[in-house]
Amino acid sequence: MQLYDELKARGLIAQVTNEEEISEMINNGKATFYIGFDPTADSLHVGHFMALCLMKRMQMAGNKPIALIGGGTAMIGDPSGRTDMRSMMTVETIQHNCDCFKKQMERFIEFGEGKAQMVNNADWLMNLNYIEFIRDIGSCFSVNNMLRAECFKQRMEKGLSFLEFNYMPMQSYDFYYLFKHYGCNMQFGGNDQWSNMLGGTELIRRKLGKDAHAMTITLLLNSEGKKMGKTASGAVWLDPNKTSPYDFYQYWRNVDDADVLKCIRMLTFLPLEEIEAMDSWEGAQLNRAKEILAYELTALVHGKEEAEKAQTAAKEIFVSGGAAANMPTTTLTDADFTDGQIGVLTLLVKCGLASSNGEARKLVQGGGVSLNGEKVADFKQQLAKDFFNEECMIKKGKKTFHKVVLG
């Protein structure tokens, strides 16, 4: 099976500008393509997973990836899919985030001469002359067409700033610049970027008289139509310091039965024939499918050694009801205690088991938190420092365990 057909079979392709030409290019390793990454955090997360896996598949087939970090456009903020305006970021923060991204991307694609490249659009956008830009580039855009774009519709009622209105021409200029200077003939992105991507292909056609192509990637949604990659404590990050390999493994191990085979098909590199054989699995077999999914994705992001540790810890915890050497652990210091005590809500947030005191309070009130096997009944409960002289085991829900020790 050729690459384009495999991408379709895995459910990865949403929209394309010209299916025949795109399939010809990527099947024969003739695509130099780019995917943009908005450096609004210091780590990639599960929401980026589809794009990273696609870049890896494309490079394996001989195509050349360009990872474009939006260091310039991040100074504006993409209005796509938002109902409010993004906060401004400093140049230093953006550069730090860019450096973090590249380190994580190296798990998926190979950078180097004649291989993948990473570029930062700040290198060309920050030096643009505004008068020349609106004359040479702005003249190629119809305001009427831009206002009909989906990415702007959602913002019109609450107010769309002129700053954000410039985002589409600037992203389109990225494609135009990469086409001219890097031979980039294709852009991939999420469904919410379709209008911006078409702006780029049209700009290239009008300015250079040449064809460029765009393809959107299917969004990773669960069976309820919600984006995957969120937990009670926030996003599922690829940085092990923000989401431990164990917690990353557990996220995929606990996906809904209705989502597991879709995730295996879209995200893993297992052969399609092997995945199709799982279509008839049910009951305990679906639990096995979840273990396969969790192991494969953890190995992809964190390496096989960490995946094996996480898998072993998960099995030990299930059998023993809580004791495992590789369990996520939080170490408390004197600074964490006030007058020799720490509140249970503060503890849950400190351990990453809740994103806020409000979230922690709901967990306790719902009967979802236990300490050393005893259910926590009072969200105002204070724990003395000597409570942690022996190991403290927190259980959240039925499947999440966390160990707390004194430093």
Identify the residue ranges that each predicted region occupies.
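Conserved nucleotide- and phosphate/pyrophosphate-binding catalytic cores
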Residues: I204-G407
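NTP-dependent nucleotidyl-transfer catalytic core
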Residues: M1-Q193, L198-T201, L208-H213, K226, ...
